[in-house]
Amino acid sequence: MPTPKERPDFFTHLQTQKPRTLPGVTHPPLKITFLGTGTSSGVPMIACDCPVCTSPDPHDNRLRSSILVESAATTLVVDTTPDFRYQMLRARVKHLDAVIFTHPHKDHVAGLDDVRAFNFFQEQEMQVYANSMTIDALMREFAYAFADKKYPGVPNLRLNPITLEPFTVGDIAVTPIQVWHLKMPVLGFRFGDFTYITDANRIDETEKAKIRGSSVMVVNALRREKHISHYTIDEAVALVHELGVPTAYFTHISHQLGLHAEVDSRLPSGLHLAYDGLVVNV
């Protein structure tokens, strides 16, 4: 598989932040692309005329949350959102080795059917990594893909159950991190020095230990007001400071958080709102 190429025309309407490369890493260099940074309804939200949803700033346009993780030899995505097809087209993804799922909520799994395009061009099954709860949901919601007699053209999926034990996808080492989305266990993941967490409002101390030492982390920051199952922006900032991670990006953002430029300008040093198309090298 070819080395990931720069995509100079990817999100050319954005003033994209220069990718950050961290010194002293021992894992394969990774390129992280934020495919989407919005909450389940996306931004703009249907039928909403608030200042964020009508903002002309492209940073305020957010597809559902997902990232693309690339090494020189392996390409994977975390979650297949309802926007997955457009996210793959927009990022010009030509090869995909695997999908890793955080949890089975629809804004994280609904686009799974569209991996069949990769089945067609790569002529092989797609490797899917998920915990047992998510696998059960996928087999129910995409039952046609797992039928004994499949209709031609349905996704060809190989389900790989994962627990909290580390595993590898190609040359990328993955450490699962269990977080809590109210009462639902959700998986975050650490890839080398990079940690990705979405849909959380609580993390046990044993799992926080897996995050410590990361150079970059991503965590959800839904809005300012308290939420039953998501961190607020203030809670997310406090978590980053508690864990001592020097650089952090906030994702899974609602239109209720406010305008990107205004919120981002008020964040402490080293902390940023992520946006669709942002690239970070670790």
Predicted regions and their residues:
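Binuclear metal-ion centers of metallo-dependent hydrolases, dominated by the metallo-beta-lactamase
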Residues: D204-V282
